[in-house]
C-alpha cells in the first residue's frame, strides 16, 4: 500500500494514477477523503477527476458528495466528448446517483457513441431498473449491440425476465431475438440454462438452431451437460426424430409438387414456359430444399450433444462436400459413431437417393399418402408454424398462380403474420381468390406497420373501388 501511495505522488499517466487512487481507496481501512479533493479541479485530467469524484460519492459526507456531484455534472454537460465519456464512466463506480439521474435521458441521446455505450454499462452497474428498456433497445442497433449485450450479461439473473420477453416476441427481428438468446447463454447460470433448454424443446426452425449453437458454445461444456441433465439422451433422440419427421413432410411436398410446372391449372399459359406459374413452383421447391438443409443442420447440432464434437464435425464436413468419396467417408464416420434408435432413418438423409426413395426410407417415422398438388399445399399450410417465412410466402404465391383455393382459416391467420412479405403474399392471393372478401379486409390493414404492405393496400383499395386513406 505504501509503495502505491508513494507512486501516486509521482508524475504518472492519468490512467495509472486513476488505478493507484482506486487501489488506495479499496485497501485503506479509513481512506482520507480530503486527499481526493484536489483531484476534482478542472485542470486535472478527466480520467483522474472522474475517478476521484466517484470514490468521494461512495463514502463522503453530504458536503463532499455535493462537491463531487457538481464535478460530475460539469463533466456530463461538457462540450468535449472525452469529458462526457469519463464523467459517464464515473457514474458506474458511484453508489450515489440521485442528483445525476436527470442527466441520463440526455446522455442516452448523446451524439457520441462512446458516451452512449458507457451509459449502458452504468445502467447495468447501478441497477437502474427504469432504464433497463434502453439496454434492450441497444441490442437492436449495430453500433451499441456489443455494449448493450455486455451490460445485460452483467445483470445476471436479474436480466432473465427481460431477455425471455424479448426472445419470445415474434414481432422482433430474428437478429434481436438472437441477441437475447445469446445473452442468456453468456449469463450461464442454472436459471438461464433452464430457460434455454425449456425453449429448445418447444422452439422450431431458426430459434431452435440458435439455441442449440448457444448451448454448444457455453464454456466447459456447461450447455451440453445442462441439456443432458434436464432432458437426457432420450429427450435429444426425440428432438432428432422430430427433425426427421419434418424432413419427411418436406420430401412428401417435393414429391407431390414435382409435377406442378406442368400442372394444368395455370390458365391460358404455356405449361412449358418460364412464366410466373413455373417460377413460383420453383421458388417453393427451393424454399423447401432450404428447409431440408436447415433441418439436417439441426440434426448435426443435436448429435454434438451425444457424441464427440470433432467426430460429428468431421462427418458433417465430409458429407457437405458433395464428393462421393468424402460423402461415403462421412457416412462411415456416422455409422461407426451413432447408436440412436432411428439411426438408419438418419443416415438415409445423407445418401445419394431421390426424395421419393428417402421418403420411403422414413416410413417408420411417417406414413406417406400421395396427395394432389393443391391438397399438398394446403397440408403444408397446416404445418405453417414449422415453415420459414419465405417458404410460407411461396405457398401463397403458388396458390395464386395456380388458382388453388385455400381455407379461410389459413388465409386469415397468415394475414396477421409478423413478417411483411408474408402478408404481401396473402393479399396478392386474396386479390385473385376472393376480391370481395379482400375488399372487406383492406380497410383494417391501411395502417400496416410495413410500408410496402400499406402501399399495397392503398393500391388495391383504389383498384377494387374501396377508396384510399381519408
Question: Model-derived features: where do they sit?
Answer:
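Amphipathic alpha-helical scaffolding segments comprising HEAT/armadillo-like alpha-solenoid repeats
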Residues: 1-9, 29-41, 62-75, 96-109, ...
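A cross-kingdom feature marking charged/low-complexity
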Residues: 287-295, 351-391, 453
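Short amphipathic alpha-helical surface patches that serve as generic macromolecular interface elements
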Residues: 392, 408, 420-427, 439
Amino acid at each position: 500500500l505504501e509503495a502505491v501511495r508513494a507512486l501516486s505522488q509521482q508524475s504518472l499517466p492519468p490512467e495509472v494514477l486513476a488505478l493507484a487512487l482506486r487501489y488506495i481507496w479499496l485497501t485503506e481501512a479509513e481512506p482520507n477523503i480530503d486527499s481526493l479533493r484536489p483531484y476534482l479541479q478542472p485542470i486535472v485530467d478527466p480520467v483522474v477527476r472522474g475517478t476521484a469524484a466517484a470514490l468521494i460519492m461512495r463514502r463522503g459526507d453530504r458536503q463532499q458528495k455535493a462537491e463531487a456531484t457538481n464535478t460530475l455534472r460539469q463533466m456530463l454537460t461538457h462540450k468535449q466528448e472525452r469529458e462526457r465519456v469519463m464523467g459517464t464512466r464515473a457514474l458506474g463506480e458511484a453508489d450515489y446517483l440521485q442528483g445525476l439521474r436527470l442527466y441520463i435521458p440526455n446522455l442516452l441521446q448523446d451524439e457520441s457513441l462512446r458516451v452512449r455505450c458507457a451509459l449502458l454499462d452504468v445502467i447495468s452497474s447501478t441497477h437502474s431498473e427504469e432504464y433497463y428498456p434502453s439496454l434492450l433497445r441497444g441490442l437492436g442497433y449495430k453500433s451499441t449491440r456489443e455494449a448493450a449485450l455486455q451490460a445485460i450479461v452483467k445483470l445476471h439473473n436479474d436480466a432473465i425476465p427481460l431477455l425471455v420477453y424479448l426472445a419470445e416476441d415474434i414481432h422482433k427481428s430474428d437478429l434481436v431475438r438472437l441477441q437475447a438468446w445469446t445473452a442468456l447463454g453468456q449469463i450461464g447460470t442454472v436459471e438461464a440454462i433452464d430457460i434455454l433448454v425449456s425453449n429448445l424443446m418447444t422452439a422450431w426452425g431458426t430459434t431452435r438452431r440458435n439455441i442449440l449453437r448457444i448451448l454448444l458454445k457455453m464454456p466447459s461444456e456447461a450447455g451440453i451437460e445442462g441439456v443432458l441433465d434436464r432432458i437426457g439422451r432420450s429427450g435429444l433422440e426425440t428432438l432428432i426424430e422430430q427433425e426427421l419427421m419434418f424432413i419427411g413432410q418436406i420430401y412428401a411436398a417435393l414429391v407431390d409438387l414435382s409435377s406442378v410446372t406442368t400442372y394444368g391449372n395455370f390458365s391460358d399459359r404455356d405449361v412449358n414456359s418460364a412464366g410466373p406459374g413455373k417460377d413460383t413452383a420453383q421458388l417453393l421447391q427451393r424454399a423447401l430444399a432450404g428447409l431440408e438443409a436447415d433441418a439436417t443442420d439441426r440434426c448435426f447440432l443435436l448429435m454434438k450433444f451425444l457424441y464427440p464434437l470433432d467426430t460429428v464435425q468431421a462427418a458433417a464436413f465430409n458429407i457437405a462436400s458433395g464428393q462421393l468419396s468424402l460423402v461415403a467417408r462421412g457416412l462411415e464416420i456416422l455409422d461407426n459413431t451413432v447408436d440412436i434408435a432411428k439411426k438408419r432413418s438418419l443416415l438415409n438423409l445423407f445418401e445419394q437417393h431421390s426424395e421419393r426413395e428417402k421418403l420411403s426410407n422414413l416410413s417408420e417415422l411417417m406414413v406417406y399418402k400421395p396427395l394432389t398438388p393443391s391438397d399438398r399445399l394446403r397440408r403444408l399450410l397446416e404445418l405453417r408454424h414449422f415453415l420459414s417465412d419465405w417458404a410460407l410466402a411461396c405457398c401463397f404465391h403458388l396458390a395464386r398462380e395456380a388458382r388453388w383455393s385455400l381455407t379461410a382459416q389459413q388465409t386469415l391467420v397468415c394475414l396477421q403474420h409478423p413478417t411483411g412479405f408474408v402478408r404481401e403474399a396473402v393479399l396478392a392471393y386474396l386479390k385473385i381468390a376472393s376480391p370481395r372478401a379482400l375488399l372487406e379486409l383492406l380497410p383494417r390493414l391501411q395502417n400496416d406497420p410495413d410500408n410496402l404492405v400499406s402501399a399495397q393496400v392503398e393500391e388495391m383499395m383504389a383498384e377494387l373501388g374501396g377508396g384510399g386513406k381519408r
